């Protein structure tokens, strides 16, 4: 399988404009990444392809076609989650193609799993939830025992619509008001 390199973005020297950052044209960057993945898939020996979220799905799909190896995708969120239902059709198409091509799909929550199954029409047997998690530190119990006089309410998450920081602010205000 040959990659059509004529559709990728290059600079005036003919080099791929691949930055690894979010450029002005994100879809072009995804295509450039796909081209790099095709070269790697032709030259490396590997057992499995892991595509981590929609930006890497086209590269993973192409690597799968070249290598015949299974592909697992990891879904932290879908465009339904990120946009709260105002889905970008280009992003949806890439997400759907990645999910359709995947041999297995890992989601980080049951909510995301249900979205993948219902909105992207995936077989439930193909989708597994593996929650984000950390091991609690030994000293956490000691922190709970300390006598704090000040009130501490913490939000741990990106400040994006899907993380719901506005809900945190509402709940924090209620908690603070009820503990006076």
Which residue ranges define each predicted feature?
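A short helix->loop->beta-strand "cap" motif at the edges of active sites that frequently abuts
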Residues: 67-70, 102, 124-126
């Amino acid at each position: 399988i040959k990659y059509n390199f004529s559709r990728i973005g290059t600079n005036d020297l003919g080099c791929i404009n691949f930055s690894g950052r979010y450029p002005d044209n994100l879809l072009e960057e995804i295509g450039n990444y796909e081209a790099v993945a095709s070269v790697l898939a032709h030259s490396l020996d590997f057992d499995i392809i892991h595509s981590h979220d929609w930006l890497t799905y086209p590269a993973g799909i192409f690597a799968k076609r070249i290598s015949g190896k299974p592909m697992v995708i990891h879904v932290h969120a879908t465009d339904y989650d990120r946009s709260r239902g105002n889905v970008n059709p280009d992003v949806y198409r890439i997400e759907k193609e990645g999910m359709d091509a995947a041999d297995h799909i890992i989601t980080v929550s049951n909510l995301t799993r249900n979205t993948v199954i219902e909105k992207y029409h995936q077989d439930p047997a193909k989708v597994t939830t593996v929650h984000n998690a950390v091991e609690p530190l030994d000293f956490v119990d000691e922190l709970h025992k300390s006598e704090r006089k000040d009130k501490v309410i913490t939000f741990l998450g990106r400040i994006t619509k899907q993380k719901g920081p506005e809900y945190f602010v509402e709940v924090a205000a209620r908690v603070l008001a009820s503990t006076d």
